[in-house]
Amino acid sequence: GRARQGSTRAPHMVGGGVVHGPKPRNYAKKVNKKVRRLALRSALAQKISEGNVIVLDDFALETPKTKTFIDFAKTLNFDGVKQLYVTNDDTDTVDRDYFLYLSTRNIEKVAAINTRDLSVYWLIKQDKVVLTKEALATIEEVLA
């Protein structure tokens, strides 16, 4: 019968609550700065030793056009390869970096980031890494 059932929201009732439902949990893992820097240094060293890092003077994109960028990538023989373009986050190059971002955001295997966003994740995820000279100088400064 219906006697002594308690609340209609009890777990054993239809429409009742969940007994041990999911709880929000923080999965973040604290990694020390020195360890994080060491990991970045070793991942970058591995990419360099494999010959997957190219340093260019500049990514000169006058207009934010994907077609222009694809032609530029073809000159580097990067068809079908996951590519990472790293630029320096200077205030002088903000427009050109934004043009690079706009030109690459619709291409499946291409990512364009600033040096402050560079992480081991990006280095492992992408096959080829293309850096500007300024970006390389900034990375050397941080990792030295």
Residue positions per predicted region:
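Glycine/serine-rich anion-binding loops at beta->alpha junctions
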Residues: 2-20
